[in-house]
Each structure stands twice: as structure tokens, then as C-alpha cells.
Regions:
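Negatively charged, low-complexity tracts enriched in Asp/Glu with abundant Ser/Thr
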Residues: 1-31
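Intrinsic disorder/low-complexity signal
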Residues: 10-14, 49, 61
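Mixed-charge, Lys/Arg-enriched low-complexity segments
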Residues: 2, 51-95
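A short, structured beta-strand/loop element
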Residues: 37-59
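Short linear motifs in intrinsically disordered/low-complexity regions
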Residues: 7-9, 24, 37-39, 45, ...
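A positively charged, amphipathic N-terminal helix/segment that binds anionic biomolecules
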Residues: 22-38, 88, 93
């Protein structure tokens, strides 16, 4: 997983999933990024948690370059109701 800081990165949403419970809304976004410096597409995940009091978010960049794997990881994350605080720990276990 890389941190993408290049201002010329192009992003495109692949899939989004939102689930709401009593006091929290979790939104999962799978997206592709294409960096101008190498032009290769990579897949990244964002998890956002919204409550009445705050919004927190975590993004894991460049988790894979294969669409099939990205969708599989995305579905595992959404089924497990992963939060922004646990995103990197969970990805570390499944990657």
C-alpha cells in the first residue's frame, strides 16, 4: 500500500457500498487511481464512518493492480463492517 501524494493522480470510482446502523453510517468506496508519473492503474479503498458528532475516514492506496482481487478485498471489507480505525489492520491480515 502506497501513499499517493502526486497532484496529477486521476481517480475513478469502481464501487460504493453504504450501511447504516442506529448511530453510524459506514461508506466503503473502491476506486482506481492512475498516476501520471507511470500511468499504471491501481486500486484503492476508502472507509468513512459518520455519526452525529464526527466523520472519520481512512484510505488505503495501491492495494492491488488486479480488478478481480480488488473486488474480492472490497467485498471482504464490507461484509466485515470494517471501520476507518481498523482498515489497515484488516488489510494487513488479508493481503
Amino acid at each position: 500500500m502506497k501513499s499517493m501524494t502526486n497532484a496529477n493522480v486521476k481517480e475513478e470510482t469502481v464501487e460504493t457500498y453504504t450501511i447504516e446502523a442506529e448511530n453510524i453510517r459506514l461508506t466503503y468506496t473502491l476506486f482506481t487511481s492512475t498516476a501520471d508519473y507511470d500511468g499504471r492503474k491501481c486500486y484503492s479503498l476508502t472507509v468513512t464512518a459518520e455519526t452525529d458528532d464526527e466523520i472519520t475516514s481512512s484510505t488505503a492506496h495501491d492495494i492491488t493492480r488486479r480488478r478481480k482481487d480488488a473486488i474480492r478485498y472490497f467485498r471482504m471489507i464490507t461484509r466485515g463492517l470494517v471501520t476507518p480505525c481498523t482498515l489497515f489492520d484488516v488489510l494487513e491480515n488479508i493481503l
